[in-house]
Amino acid sequence: MNPTKRNSHAIVEFVDVLLRDGAVIQADAIVTVAGVPLLGISLRAAIAGMTTMTEYGIFDGWDADHRRRNAQP
């Protein structure tokens, strides 16, 4: 039995879902040397299309300012 769905479009479908629905990545790390904590890292990243970002209230001000600046002649 051969598969009926081809995997050639998998990356396109992944990007489509990522832009439509978005994703949030959060990571925390502590760098220690000899048991002594030296550096703390906290990372939060969101990736999505601008439509999704503005629906969730992310980049509202930036999007409005950017559109206003680009609309001026």
From Swiss-Prot:
GO CC annotations on file: gas vesicle; vesicle membrane
Compartments where found: Gas vesicle
Subunit structure: GvpF to GvpM interact with each other in vitro, and may form multi-subunit complex(es). Might interact with GvpA.
Family membership noted in the UniProt record: Belongs to the gas vesicle GvpA family.
GO molecular function terms attached to this record: structural molecule activity
Induction of expression: In PHH4 (a deletion of the p-vac locus) transcribed in all growth phases, maximal expression in mid-stationary phase. An unstable 6kb transcript able to cover gvpD-gvpE-gvpF-gvpG-gvpH-gvpI-gvpJ-gvpK-gvpL-gvpM is detected, as well as smaller transcripts. Gas vesicles appear earlier when grown in static culture, possibly due to O(2)-limitation.
Name of the protein this chain belongs to: Gas vesicle protein M2
Cited function: Proteins GvpF to GvpM might be involved in nucleating gas vesicle formation. A minor component of the gas vesicle. Gas vesicles are hollow, gas filled proteinaceous nanostructures found in several microbial planktonic microorganisms. They allow positioning of halobacteria at the optimal depth for growth in the poorly aerated, shallow brine pools of their habitat. Expression of 2 c-vac DNA fragments containing 2 divergently transcribed regions (gvpE-gvpF-gvpG-gvpH-gvpI-gvpJ-gvpK-gvpL-gvpM and gvpA-gvpC-gvpN-gvpO) allows H.volcanii to produce gas vesicles.
Keywords assigned: Gas vesicle, Plasmid
This protein's record includes keyword Metal-binding: no
Additional detail: Encoded in a 14-gene locus called c-vac which produces cylindrical gas vesicles only in the stationary growth phase.
